[in-house]
């Protein structure tokens, strides 16, 4: 479509949206001048005329859909099954109270729970004899100077979830069946039983337990 000339017979002023201009074009065409346009007297300007009539089909703008290969990744934290012994004292924070201090409950019976892979355990009474409980072997440092494998999760506490219906004893010694899942913090150290087949690593030393073993979770 060819540009259309416009004769403007005004003084040297800014043309605002209310200014009139005569366009040598069909009545159903539009000529738009912005308020920032400055025109001299008898200047001829080229205006692009846009036909808005229904006779000409308007171009349809379609969004280009780029198909991408979606790879579904389930990010599931590896966990380790351990058994908490009966009478284990567990800490929790009452989520219904603001600035609530830590409270505690005691397990009435032994219970299997899931702990995050990478917890640190010690065997026997020697807390310095530490191992990392792993689901997959950790990379071995090229120059291993520390005899203890560092905790990859850098945990400042170890938490687990007690499922609903777990029976615990309150501070008063009364049994209480949990109505919902309950998040608790293990004491430090915490005696647990880890099961045969669990992987332990201490730098380049890697071992798979041949039988169940009582250890302490430390952090």
Swiss-Prot record:
Domain of life: Viruses
Name of this chain's protein: Uncharacterized protein L686
Organism, as annotated: Acanthamoeba polyphaga mimivirus
